[in-house]
Amino acid sequence: MSLTNEQLIEAIASKSVSEIVELIAAMEEKFGVSAAVAAAAPAAGGAAAAEEKTEFNVVLTEAGANKVAVIKAVRGATGLGLKEAKDLVESAPANLKEGISKGEAEELKKALEEAGAKVEIK
């Protein structure tokens, strides 16, 4: 007796839930498998992608050729005095701001790069 897929589906559909559970148990035993759903393994770096970063650090990596403009930009962004801003620029690489939003970090990076500095967001 050979059943088509359609006939097999109709036969299963006509069974009660308890009969289907018994059928599944018998199939598991016959074929040596389990009907349990396997959990999908996360893709490489999945945990990092799922946990999106919300706080960023802006790091001045190099002052560039126009140090005066960079010092002015650092003063405007951080509120430091002239001497503190100059010391910070000359001690590059240095953290300018820590724990700021992505938008604020991007704005600061843009302003410093326009002044001639090399900046990283971490």
Curated annotation (Swiss-Prot):
InterPro entries: Ribosomal_bL12, Ribosomal_bL12_C, Ribosomal_bL12_C/ClpS-like, Ribosomal_bL12_oligo, Ribosomal_bL12_oligo_N_sf. It comes from the Bacteria. The keyword Ribonucleoprotein applies. It holds the Pfam family Ribosomal_L12. One of its GO terms (molecular function) is structural constituent of ribosome. The keyword Ribosomal protein applies. GO terms for biological process: translation. Keywords: Ribonucleoprotein, Ribosomal protein. CDD domains: Ribosomal_L7_L12. GO terms for cellular component: cytosolic large ribosomal subunit. Belongs to the bacterial ribosomal protein bL12 family. NCBIfam families: L12. Homodimer. Part of the ribosomal stalk of the 50S ribosomal subunit. Forms a multimeric L10(L12)X complex, where L10 forms an elongated spine to which 2 to 4 L12 dimers bind in a sequential fashion. Binds GTP-bound translation factors. Forms part of the ribosomal stalk which helps the ribosome interact with GTP-bound translation factors. Is thus essential for accurate translation. This is Large ribosomal subunit protein bL12. The gene is rplL.
